[in-house]
């Protein structure tokens, strides 16, 4: 059985104690380890965990998360910080960003400072925006060397210049972004403005399967968010056909359209994403 897609329906299936093999297309808050159940989701948390691994692999020590206020930001911060800790990393800092309108108005201000509050000690009710006085430089003994941004294409079009305005374009901080900022709409000016930024993308949209990419984008009228779901459907079929291996063979890996797929002991499917970089007006592989 493939599905369901909604978290509450996944929880209902778990309560039913079905004997069928189930590939749930979402991950509930509390995962249960059952021999007939795997969880496969395209979620911001999933992407944040992959970002933590990628940034850690690049030798970064002190990441700053630039994320939206509200539930989405909370989910990203929690997932990234948990994974960073598992990797042996130290302090993760966060700064909350306002709406597109607030970012736009910030163009006439002082830009975005690369400072933040430690994730572990900041209550979720305390949000900061555009480098407010509540942000502290760093308490971990080192300076910020990476910033992970979760924003739409329009928002990141303001965020990156605002960072450069405040910190200088030659700052030593490497900027990373989630696929939320990549919707296939970037023209040459945008690509030049984003120079040096690395972002995660599913392999299909990074060029690993050009035929399926063309088929998917044609089917969804070039909507990248829907194309990612299209790729998820293709991967769900592959996972269902390799359910026993994913569930029972530690280290088993499928090269999927949404990532290189492996399973945790609870059979939560992890995705290793492709990372791309804007370089001299082009998009090239970052890893």
Language-model-derived ranges and their functions:
Residues 37, 117-122, 142-146, 160-234:
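Extracellular/periplasmic periplasmic-binding protein-like sensory domains
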